[in-house]
């Protein structure tokens, strides 16, 4: 089993949200994806993150009431087509999972570790969805950095940050391989200077 898992990871690629199919994710798979997503390094077992699921009509409603309206406020001269495109971004996938980093004050556990734990949730959700055969991509885009969008998703302004949106859907084509860094460019073996 572990050899199969390593083979999967060595070939893993994301299908872009703009090319995926808005196929639904069945509830058993979704439950497993979320369960895997929460089995991450979490110093102190603080669970310093929230997971918000947008599926079905919620994708359209959130786009209409929040993404489109906010984009129009930020870009008052944008043409209708561009606003419509932004409003419908969540419809590219069958489900969109938002992960919010929600750090808490702690004497021993640094903020950075809590934020890394939230990023690990995103990565685990991405990997588990892909391992089940779904197309999946982890994105941020402009709305991940917008406080009003954060608040609309239940985040606390000045404390929380959106770690990412994981788009999950179907695929009709396997994604193309992209250039990966060469190991000798990114890996070093430390040794004491003589």
Specify the residue positions occupied by each region the protein language model found.
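N-terminal amphipathic, basic helical "cap/leader" segment at the start of enzyme domains
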Residues: 1-92, 194
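C-terminal helix-cap and adjacent tail motif
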Residues: 4-11, 16, 158-194
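Small-aliphatic-rich amphipathic alpha-helix that forms the alpha element of a beta-alpha
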Residues: 37, 97, 103-151
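Short Asp/Glu-rich motifs
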Residues: 56, 148-149, 155-156
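Short, hinge-like loop/turn segments at secondary-structure boundaries
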Residues: 69-70, 155-157
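Structural motif
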Residues: 94-97, 164
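Helix-biased detector of long, well-ordered alpha-helical tracts
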Residues: 102-107, 190-194
């Amino acid at each position: 089993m572990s050899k199969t898992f390593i083979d999967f990871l060595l070939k893993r690629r994301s299908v872009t949200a703009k090319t995926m199919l808005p196929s639904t994710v069945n509830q058993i798979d979704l439950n497993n994806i979320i369960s895997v997503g929460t089995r991450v390094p979490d110093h102190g077992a603080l669970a310093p993150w929230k997971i918000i699921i947008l599926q079905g009509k919620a994708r359209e409603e959130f786009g209409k009431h929040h993404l489109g309206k906010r984009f129009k406020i930020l870009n008052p001269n944008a043409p209708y087509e561009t606003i419509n495109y932004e409003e419908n971004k969540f419809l590219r996938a069958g489900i969109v999972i938002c992960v919010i980093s929600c750090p808490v004050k702690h004497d021993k556990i640094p903020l950075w570790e809590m934020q890394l734990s939230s990023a690990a949730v995103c990565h685990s959700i991405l990997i588990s969805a892909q391992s089940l055969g779904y197309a999946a991509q982890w994105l941020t885009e402009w709305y991940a950095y917008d406080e009003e969008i954060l608040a609309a998703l239940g985040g606390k302004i000045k404390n929380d940050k959106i770690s990412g949106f994981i788009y999950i859907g179907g695929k009709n084509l396997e994604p193309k391989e992209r250039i990966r860094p060469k190991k000798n460019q990114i890996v070093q073996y430390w040794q004491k200077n003589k």
